[in-house]
Regions:
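Glycine/tyrosine- and acidic-biased, solvent-exposed loop/turn segments at the edges of beta-strands
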Residues: 1-245
């Protein structure tokens, strides 16, 4: 009579068994062209994986370990231009994630266990910086800077994804055009707008996102004007600020 191994002994033997050799698999299109090439081991993806378009151009390259994406993933557009390059660890994004448009980098972000963390940079299609943020637990948290044509136009602060504290807007010459404070994403405190020479133009007090009382307005010589009605020069300056001039 044959002696059956104890179940625990069988489990140990199975665990000690060496993994099988990786098997190459290819998916082909109607004309026989390779559309996907990957490696499998013990029924799961293990090794390089590549995807191609019908002309043979590479669309995606990555790597798997025991069924989980691990390493660098690179994605290309149909014309061969880079779309995204990111790092994975155990199946989730972990490390640098760079995104491209027309071959130019438009965002750079660090990922930690699948969640955005650390510095986040955004660029326009000319490659000029448009935003510099900091992420914590997937939310904007900390100082934030925004740019237009490489010129700083706003400095703000965020807390857990909400604007918090002072926010300052700048003109192309670096002068302050507006300053205000936020509490939990709502205007809270004085909002001040300025003439191009830096003189105070308007001041409005906010509480929990709503104005309190009438605004105080001043002409370019610093003289108080009618609170109930903005003068034409004040209105024109407000229009400029709205347009971003």
């Amino acid at each position: 009579m044959a002696v059956q191994p104890h179940p625990a002994e069988a489990d140990v033997a199975a665990a000690a068994a060496p993994p099988s050799a990786p098997l190459l698999l290819e998916e082909h299109g109607p004309a026989g062209q390779v559309l996907q090439r990957c490696w499998m081991r013990d029924g799961v993806l293990h090794g390089p994986l590549e995807q191609f378009n019908e002309r043979g151009g590479t669309l995606m390259k990555t790597h798997f370990e025991d069924g989980k994406m691990h390493g660098v993933m690179t994605v290309y557009a149909e014309d061969g231009k880079l779309v995204q390059q990111s790092q994975f660890r155990n199946g989730v994004p972990h490390g640098a994630m760079d995104t491209y448009a027309n071959g130019r980098c438009i965002s750079q972000q660090m990922m930690v266990d699948g969640v955005p963390a650390g510095q986040s940079l955004s660029y326009d299609e000319a490659g000029q910086l448009t935003a510099k943020l900091y992420m914590f637990d997937g939310q904007v948290h900390g100082p934030a800077e925004f740019y237009h044509q490489s010129l700083l136009v706003r400095k703000s602060n965020y807390k857990a994804g909400l604007m918090e504290g002072e926010s300052i807007d700048y003109d192309p010459q670096g002068g302050v055009v507006q300053s205000c404070t936020y509490r939990e994403n709502l205007l809270h405190g004085p909002l001040r707008r300025f003439w191009p020479d830096g003189e105070l133009m308007e001041e409005v007090l906010y509480r929990d996102g709503k104005p309190v009382g009438a605004p105080s307005r001043y002409d370019q010589k610093g003289r108080r004007t009618d609170n109930a009605k903005a003068t034409p020069d004040v209105l024109e300056r407000l229009r400029q600020l709205v347009r971003g001039n």
